[in-house]
Each structure stands twice: as C-alpha cells, then as structure tokens.
Amino acid sequence: MSFDLASRLASRRAEDLYRQRPLLESAQGPDVVVDGQPLLAFCSNDYLGLANHPEVIAALRAGAERWGVGGGASHLVVGHSGPHHELELALAEFTGRPRALLFSTGYMANLGAVTALVGKGDTVLEDRLNHASLLDAGLLSGARFSRYLHNDPASLAARLDKAEGNTLVVTDGVFSMDGNLADLPALAAVAQARGAWLMVDDAHGFGPLGASGGGIVEHFGLGQEQVPVLIGTLGKGFGTAGAFVAGSEELIETLIQYARPYIYTTSQPPAVACATLKSLELLRRESWRRQHLAALIARFRHGAEALGLTLMDSFTPIQPILVGGSRQAVALAGMLRARGIMVGAIRPPTVPANSARLRVTLSAAHSEAQVDRLLEALGESWRQLSSSLLAEIEAEEGDDA
C-alpha cells in the first residue's frame, strides 16, 4: 500500500489548515520585507528587540573571527568551546542556580530533560496546553503520561495521587498561544507535597518577566527548591538561538550522561554563544526595554478592548485576539496584510477547535505610533470581516428561501 500524501494535503487545504512559509527578505525587526512586500510585523518572538541589535551583531562577528563558524563536534567530543562554557556559567549565575547546560534548540532541551529524568515505571504529568515539544517529550519518555486540566492545581493533585515511580510535573511558564502565566506557586506546592519535581519551560518568560528579566520564576519569587528543572530558550527574549537547562549540579551531570539530544548532536556555533553573552548583558542592564514593552502591552489592550475585540487574560507580549473559525482568522490576517500589517493566524491543531486566533506579539523595538497603526488596521479589518460574514449569512438565507 502506498502513502496517499496528496489526499492528506488536500484535506488540510479544504479545512483551511494548510500552512505555508512566508519568505523573510530582511533582518528581523518591526519593519520587514516578506515575499517582496514591506510590512509592519507583530508576529516575532524577539520580545526585547535584541535580534538585530548592533552590539549583538558585533559580538557574533568577533566570535566568528576568533572561533570560526561550526561547532565541529558534539559537546562530549571536541565541540564544547570556551564561549559555550562561559555562557553556561553566565546563565547559571543569571538564574541563581549552580549549573546550566546549553542545547541547540528549545525542542531538544525539553526532549532531553524529560527523557533523561523519567522512563518506564515513572510518571509524567503535563498541562493540557503545554507546547508540542513538551507533550512529545512526555510521550517519548516511556513513562506513564497524563495531562491535567489547564492551570488547575486540583486536577494535578488528583493525578499525582495516582502517580507511580519518579514523578515529573511539566508546565509552560508562559503559554505560547494564550499568553497567560502558569500558577507556579500553587503548582509547586502541590508537587512538593507529593514528592514530585516541577519542570518549567519558560521560553516566553525570560526577558519580558521579572525585575531583571529572569522570567516567571523571578516574577513569583520562587527558587530551585520549588522549581528543580528550569528551561529557557535563547531565540526569543535573548534574540539569538539555542536553549538551556538550569538546575543543580546533579541535574546537569545527569543530563550530560543521559540526555540523548545533548549527547548525539553537534554543538551550536561558538559565535552564537558569543552573541548570547552580549544579549544577556543587554537584557539585564537595559531595564527600559521591559518598561517600554509593558507600556506598549497596556496601550494595545486598552485600544483593542475599545474596538470590541476579544482578548485573553495576558499581560505578556503575547496578545491573542480570539476569532473562532479558521477561515475567519485567515481572512482577518489577510485583510491586515493588505493594510501593511503582518500578524499570524493560529489555527487547529495548534489551538483547540473553534478557537482560531490572531497571535499579536509585541516587542520593545515597536513604537507607540506603530501600535496605534496596528489598532487602526484592526478596527478597519474587523469591520470589513463583520460585513463579509453578514453578507454571507444573508446570501445563505436567500438561497434557503
């Protein structure tokens, strides 16, 4: 029997779920060129505006001149260079933990941490809305895998009462499609009371959250005792690439010995680690970026609510606008693009059925005037979409008459 890939692709198209890759023809930033069209972008995860920072670029250039381009080998052979080691030390100090370990991607960090810590005879409990990489890690670990109700400590407690072996509770810090925060104090209390470890993937929290950009753990004033396993990515708030796990000496040594995505892959280019060291310095030093970003978020929410748009409970840079149907979300994104604004339409299976949305993301690189331009375009596009839907309903009623 042959693979019928054509019918699978046709089904995706028919359901308005077909994904296509926009071609970026400029550097990252608010003003981009995509598929030949100049656009004002509100869909990047470059929350602090560091991806195209001149000092970060200079650090990358200097790093390449000193260390070359490729990592050359895995960390355990001859690929663990000076910049990698220096960055791990800096990230450990930044997170207030004894050690940190670099991974090439956030997906690999999540997969490596979960599969190294639990296996057959153990238990993994995850939030239902966790990132796909966390869910995949739980399934691939071989441990007993279950999902608790979103951000619900009582649901977690009920599942913990049935857990077996070593138990790992896993949650996003900031949920990437909703923008809300995990209730870490409550989740940590429930996990600790039952002898489980809590692992937090704070991909979207590092940079925007916390007084010094230390993410959700700093935001809630928690430490290693409450959150033994802390994951961070470097391609969002840091503006570079890669990821890390921070924790105890024993945790990091365990990952070095058992995390297959760490052991069996070439290290990231050393120059990227040089760039990240500079971006970490800027992230900590330039607190105005977080302050400006917070002001933009408040400005956007006030304007969007005045337009009657349905927002979610988020004070993070992720500001979803609930639309409902996939076709309507795609249409609204297209109307914005016709007005020179780029916002991503998020559809199932990334989000639950009938909860398609526009995922607006704000950056410290945006200006107040650019946010106002987005709001103006949203108002015009929303009215256009409403008129189109009304016309379709009237046409259908006419056909039924």
Curated annotation (Swiss-Prot):
- Top-rank taxon, per record: Bacteria
Q: Does the keyword Transferase apply?
A: yes
Q: Where does pyridoxal 5'-phosphate bind?
A: 106-107, 176, 204, 233
| Entry's EC annotation | 2.3.1.47
Residues modified as N6-(pyridoxal phosphate)lysine: 236
Q: Provide the alphabetized UniProt keywords.
A: Biotin biosynthesis, Pyridoxal phosphate, Transferase
One GO molecular function term?
8-amino-7-oxononanoate synthase activity
Tell me if Transferase is a UniProt keyword of this record: yes
What are the recorded Gene Ontology BP terms? biotin biosynthetic process
Names of the cofactor(s): pyridoxal 5'-phosphate
Write down the InterPro entries for this protein, in alphabetical order: Aminotrans_II_pyridoxalP_BS, Aminotransferase_I/II_large, AON_synthase_class-II, AONS_Archaea/Proteobacteria, AONS_Proteobacteria, PyrdxlP-dep_Trfase, PyrdxlP-dep_Trfase_major, PyrdxlP-dep_Trfase_small
Annotated family: Belongs to the class-II pyridoxal-phosphate-dependent aminotransferase family. BioF subfamily.
Q: Quaternary structure per UniProt?
A: Homodimer.
Q: Which NCBIfam families match?
A: bioF
Q: What does this protein do?
A: Catalyzes the decarboxylative condensation of pimeloyl-[acyl-carrier protein] and L-alanine to produce 8-amino-7-oxononanoate (AON), [acyl-carrier protein], and carbon dioxide.
Name this protein carries in UniProt: 8-amino-7-oxononanoate synthase
* Gene that this polypeptide is encoded by: bioF
